[in-house]
Amino acid sequence: MLSLIAILCACTGPTETNTGTSSETAGSATGTETATEAVTGTETGSAAADTDTQTETETKPTVSEDVIGIANVANAGYAMAGSCRNTDGYSNLHANDNDLSTPFSSQDFSAAESDVYLFVDLTRAYTVRSVVLLPAAGEAELFPVDFDLQVSDDGQAWTTVQSRTDVSGVGEAGVTVDMGGVEASFVRLLVHRMAEDKGKYRFALGEMQVLADVRRTDNLVLRQNDIWLYTDTSATLTAAYRRIANVTEEAPLRFFTDDPAVAEIDCNTGSITPRGFGDTLVYAYDGENLTACHVRVLDDTQTAFRISTFYHSNFGYPDVIPACLDYMKEAGIGFLEETRTYDAAGNQVCDYMMYLCAKRDIFYSVSDPLHDLALSKASQSRIIELVQKYENRAGFGGIYLVDEPHEESNDYARVARIIHDYNHHITPHLNLLPIGGFPSWDEYVSEYCAITGGTHRMEYLSYDNYCFMADGGFNWGVYNSLNKIRQYGLKYNASTGYYMQCMEIRGAYRISSDEELLFNASMGLAYGMKNFKWFVYLTPIGGGGEPFTTGVIGPDFKPSVMYEGVKAANARIAEWGKVLGKSDAVEVYHSDAVSGNEVVPEDFVIRQTSDNAAIYALYQSLEGDGRQYVVVVNRDFGKGRDKEFTFAVTEGLPSLELYDGGAWTSLDIGSGSFSLFIAAGDSAILRLPEGYDFRRPAAKPSDNLALGRAAFVSSSQYTFWTESDKASYRLTDGETASGGWLAGNRDTNPIVLIDLGEVRQISRVELFVFVTMEKRFPGSATIEVSADGVTWTQVFSSQITAGADGSASCGFDKADARYVRITAGGVRCALGEIGIYAQ
């Protein structure tokens, strides 16, 4: 119950609102008989309605907790079924949407006596008076024949309240079942016998209504009652309808907040402005009814790694998923990467899964139905509408794009960029292919980065490649893949992530031991990963033709033999993230030569004097003065292979600290050496003194400031299945006579952005012809520069023509720039090279 004590709440004047929060959440009313009226909310609460609205503080009103009537509360909850048709206009979402024209149906069964459930999660406890089951339009003969009505406070343990048998001849009014005022958070229809339909058996409903006591504190139904924000985002609190019409439709809404230090709310418009991290309640009041909404302002300034898991809802059922999510929370997994729209029973799960995840403080990457309707080809406005559909909802963390795209990867890169540009807190969830199988992998990755990235930090550049083989062997190529992704992340300013093996596929990959699970995480640490992702959570039994036997959660929906190892590894990842979450692995070495990696140099800051297989990483902070750290990984992950490492330190190193147990401990290096005990597959983090830089000296700088730098483009074309001479990275590879970049087919006036890495003074840009595509050379060029990626200054705009040497020189007054943005005049333009010079 809401507190009835009046409190003083901050009330601010009109502020700019975020119109992207207006879409309805799951279960919103559609305006039929039980949703008594639509509420315009912010429009009715205007300053003209009350000249006293701009006061600095206002008192939140108190309202009576007396019951004011009985109304349907199911439509503000979530309906899920043990069997659900999701074709031909049927959906679980229709079971409680207050619209008799949209039906629910179970799938077909071969026997009439098949227990099938349909439940409504009311999201809180109500005193339930009755349940009304309304027949599906045109399918009254498919009304349940024998059934129980049950209640639960947790969705797990059910109590039967009423039963009906031999039900037939149901009219439009349906069947009303007295529930006797039972307290319930869940109401379930358990059907024991179904009617025949074309030789099969199923049941169908038009609506399942739950009539319960309504009070002034739950009569006014909000479009969102749980909102997550960041300090640079906003939302607007709006109301959907009143369950009981106890005030006029024109009644103005007023808004209040419990804690203005966390979130202020405009008294008239309901516009919520974050002010600090934390949780608070905000309220909407219409003169009679007072409804609360939880608001959380998330702290994205913390230094941390993300711990995620790859998730297939199509291998789970509604009655077991809450427990599986509890296991996820307990294991320390904070981000669920959904890849399916429907569960194994046929339910559309987007809204309910997000709700369940939010209750457990887990972020959810949604697989919206639009994903099945060519998301890669969707317009920019349609993609933004998709983000707005879920924006600011509790639990919303990302949008699933695709797993392992092939030649369509550039199309998905465009989608990822649109999502980031609209709201950089939302993660476009996409996983790239591992190395191998096609010759254009470098072009494949670089073009994804070039289209997705820009002046911002990209999150996340992600891929998979597994190493613990079914025959007991180890895939040594994983080190090359990790290093390649690390290098692309550094070049294109991308946080990286990778999938860690936690499954068994017969004949391919083995069940990982605790030490192997930890080593999987330690490898990610060594190579600078920021997103540690477990593959796979639910066991994909029969999925995709691969013979999976288990995942983090076994086929019985209980923790598998690997669960405790995953949990322990996650605890280590969380500790590492507190130190290195905002640092990059700028150099990585091995104690010996392995695939695609260098041997640790003799002049590295520490030199091992023992003889243990190890990985070394030099980290540099992205903040402040760039403090440096060293990570050492025990590469021996066999059971019981804990090792003592001894090291000599570089001459003149004044101090060295070890991160242990959440604190820094000074090591005794007075003798020029020290030792560490590192468990099998585990790692150690060392902190170097402030002001010390132990990176290898950079190569002699070129006069061409663009050489080797990241080139970001508005579009790109390359050949996926064969070696390609077309790629954006060729714009800065120093080769003017071969290869280059080709814009997309419909890209008018395409853009290239060069990141110089730091602010430099420049006065000339050279544009070179793509030697096999001279006719695609742009007819004009506009050049803009920026020091911060926010404020831009145009320094050149003119028609251009390539000279005899195949280049056009664009000169201008000296300007300070980190970013150089070139707009090429024309359609499907091509360039062979770009040079940027100080003189």
What are the residue ranges of the model-derived segments?
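Glycan-processing catalytic domains of CAZymes
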Residues: 299-654, 660-691
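Ser/Thr-rich, Pro/Gly/Ala-heavy low-complexity intrinsically disordered linkers and tails
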Residues: 12-64, 282
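C-terminal motif of bacterial Sec signal peptides marking the signal peptidase cleavage site
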Residues: 8-10
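Low-complexity, Pro/Thr/Ser/Gly/Ala-rich linker/spacer regions in secreted
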Residues: 55-75, 211-223, 228, 294-304, ...
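Aromatic, loop-rich ligand-recognition surfaces of beta-strand-rich domains
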Residues: 99-160, 171-216, 733-794, 804-839
